[in-house]
């Protein structure tokens, strides 16, 4: 029996909450909190008739530590699931520390204002020392490790699909399939079609910042950075088909490089259609992806936030998206002295997701792992004081839960490799 506070009520949060309500013997009580309480109320009203989980709602500004503390102290949850924006990771972690509550999220911290002088100085120092220049990394949250250890609390970072399940796949491969792993290629393919010329499948602001950043990968323990979208490969994905994919910087590369230091190379690829890339490049060229505030008719606006307001809400894409996603990891290495390859992945159908929880597969593949990660924490499978990423825990019960609750794994012991 557990009480959980979920902060956020967007597409991913809605899936995670819906899945929590399917496991009422563990998630006995849920409080859904967001800046817009009416969204929480609507979701609660939709779910309440079909679950034994007791659902309440609350309004909270996740940028305000005191508001968060007031809510946490009032509700007294066993766990806070942060499924809000990554800009708010640190304030929510601060509140959890102040109130003595375990924490989890689905994406690592990044700043909302990348022109803030204090943040900029730290960022530029990190770029020189680490060797990559994407705006998001784990250093801010890893800095909380001792605080959580001293408090006897667990913080689980990045428990979506990628990051999240992909790291569990890596831990599983290291535990069961290999004696030594030489290379890891993480492949994220969305073969869905929503019918729009341009739309993003999750938060547009976060998505566009991610894909317009310089790409990077880890080789022999060091970062190699490349211009954005400059390395392209083709791959034939199971149940999706041949797709173009591009090398991106992604946060799990950083944690995997730290926790699996003997791996010689770690890369991340994501598929994109030509229409998406053409639109993104045009928007970038005219300044619409900028995070720097500008003055327009006497009002300050941030271009990328204005663009977000114009684009379709990712939560609205569910009923019109058809096709499948395929996300997984390809490994090379050795087992019992012999060369070996291995591919573990999940295929998810957009329309099946919509039938079950009213969501497209992008939100589903992030929301289900969030629920399963919370399940691991609440049942005692994943608990140790400190700040951790998914690969630092036992992958077996987590992958079993994913198999059970909607994201079953597939395996290929002779996959085509990415050159």
Residue ranges and their predicted role:
Residues 36-39:
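Helix N-cap at the beta1-alpha1 junction of Rossmann-like dinucleotide-binding domains, i.e.
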Residues 29-31:
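Short beta-strand element of Class I
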Residues 50-64:
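Rossmann-fold cofactor-recognition segment
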Residues 175-419:
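C-terminal catalytic/substrate-binding lobe primarily of soluble NAD(P)-dependent oxidoreductases
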Residues 4-11:
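Conserved N-terminal Rossmann-fold NAD(P)-binding element of oxidoreductases
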